[in-house]
Amino acid sequence: SLLDDKVLFKSDGMPTYHLANIVDDHLMEISHVIRGEEWLPSMPLHVMLYRSFGWDAPEFAHLPLILKPIGNGKLSKRDGDKMGFPVFPLEWKTEEGISSGYREKGFFPEAVVNFLALLGWNDGTEKELFSLEELATTFDLKRVHKSGAKFDPEKNKWFNHQYLIQKSDEELAKQFLPIVAEQTGKIEAIEINKLTKIVSLIKERAHFVNEFWELSNFFFEEPTAYDEKAAKNWKEETPQLMKNLIEVLNEIDDFTSNTIETIVKEWMIRNEIGMGKIMQPFRLSLVGALKGPHLFDIVEIIGKEETIKRIQKAVTTL
């Protein structure tokens, strides 16, 4: 008497959601139904349907809602579209447009699962990173909070970064390879060992593999422009200093990072040349900016010939 009458079949004979859901779960032998709290009002009806069929009902649990990052209310697709983060696992196309998915954005599945598991739950400690195996053994519905949890897009990215830096350089290099091939059009010329070294230098600064190219394009292509603010460090005496540096580099046979750094710095000390007079123009010549990995690691990877070529171009351009 406390429940209103529910329509179980439409006028065309098709079952409504309530009936179809019960039959589907029973046929699939679902043992636990875990869903959002908005389905709590439907639970008595579903239990009655199970009893009417003479079936054992599964265990029911209702989770608090995932809330908007800003403001009040349930997280929606529009929130993701407006703020630039995915809501769906895969790209979702509608008449209104395309909503990018977690896969297309570059999220690792295990990172997303970890992030979502901690929305309204914890294991009683400060621990945040859980493998799938740990979650399977540790997760307990009794520790799920009753109030909703706000969705934090930046925390979501943080989780992906944590999983990214834990992956081996070799694995990430294989994922990065098709991106480099697409950008350069030279898949045959790409050495996986070189790519692995590059990944080791840049992954700490990335949240996603698809950010690697922006962080490393100078390893594959010479700068086409120079940062205007950084170019102000290019003084009147800089061209001659860079020409002298080329002579020093030309004499180095063991062209490895440590050796190059030692020889260049010894030359600077002997000639009483300040660090800023060489290092900043040197980096600007190779990268086009003053940011990036350790300078001499860059020099080793791009090689002597390319290093000298870029310095010469900067001397004639800046």
Model-derived segments and spans:
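Catalytic adenosine-cofactor/nucleotide-binding cores of aminoacyl-tRNA synthetases and other
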Residues: 54-225, 287-318
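Long, amphipathic alpha-helical coiled-coil segments characteristic
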Residues: 229-260, 264
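Generic structural signal for isolated residues within well-ordered alpha-helices
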Residues: 48-49, 134, 266, 297
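Short, charged/polar micro-motifs that form catalytic or ligand-binding hotspots
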Residues: 36, 102, 268, 272
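Helix-rich, typically C-terminal accessory recognition domains appended to large enzymatic cores
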Residues: 256-301, 306
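Charged catalytic carboxylate motif
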Residues: 45, 111, 241
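A short, ordered amphipathic alpha-helix with a cationic face
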Residues: 36, 145-149, 165-170, 234-236, ...
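Active-site cores that bind ATP or allylic diphosphates and position pyrophosphate for catalysis
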Residues: 1-82, 86, 98, 123
